[in-house]
Amino acid sequence: MVRAFAYEEIGETSTEAHASVEDNKRDRTRRVINYNLRSTTMISSLSKRLKIDECKNQDPEQNPNRVASSPSLCHVKSKRPQKGVSNKPILDMDFLNEEELEKIDRHYKKISDSDKGADVILVNSEGLQRKLKLKRWDMTSTSNYVLGSGWNKVVTENILETGTRLRLWSFHSPDMLFFALVLSDPDLAPTKDWECLNLLAKLTVETACLEASQDADTMSSLVSDTELDLELRL
């Protein structure tokens, strides 16, 4: 099922007519391009562009109220200096399953030294894969998800610079969470992102980590479930 991250809009407006036109364009694009991924719902909202802002090296603070926190997706440049998405709460957290949430929670609570967060594989448009860890950090007024244990290599390999516009999709193989990274050019036609996404899905299915998904039923279960636009600030 294809879903878009739902964000709380602050200071942004759009007309219903404009949203309807954009939805129709997305619907047509999916019908033409969607030959590798099986989508069951429309992306019903416009892509939200977010700016990755500095977390100012704040120390994580305990936040016992997990439900009330406002998590957002961000990345870690190194162990201490970290940077994250601006403080817009993610309203739809369904891109994580129960096992992944438990691993993230165990790392956050420091239950064991062996708890490192949830395993994630980031795939770029060339099919290059990088294993990362998805973790949770609580700041003074917000709770962030961070990508660590290899993000610096992602920046280098994809030549990411300040102001780079990129799009992250999440999807699951039978036992692994993937993030597909697509550099997003606002001047390109909307179909380009779908072409890149389908290419990523095809390349991912062919890798060794998805050997178990060679039968048709398992392969058909590989579906995109999250979309997020980001603007990188290093």
From Swiss-Prot:
| A Pfam family of this chain | At2g31720-like
Query: Which portions of the sequence form the region Disordered?
Result: 55-88
Feature: DNA-binding region: 87-185
Q: What is the residue range of the signal peptide feature?
A: none
**MF annotations from Gene Ontology:** DNA binding
Keyword terms: DNA-binding, Nucleus, Transcription, Transcription regulation
Q: What is this protein called?
A: Putative B3 domain-containing protein At2g18810
Q: Which organism is it from?
A: Arabidopsis thaliana
Its lineage reads:
Eukaryota, Viridiplantae, Streptophyta, Embryophyta, Tracheophyta
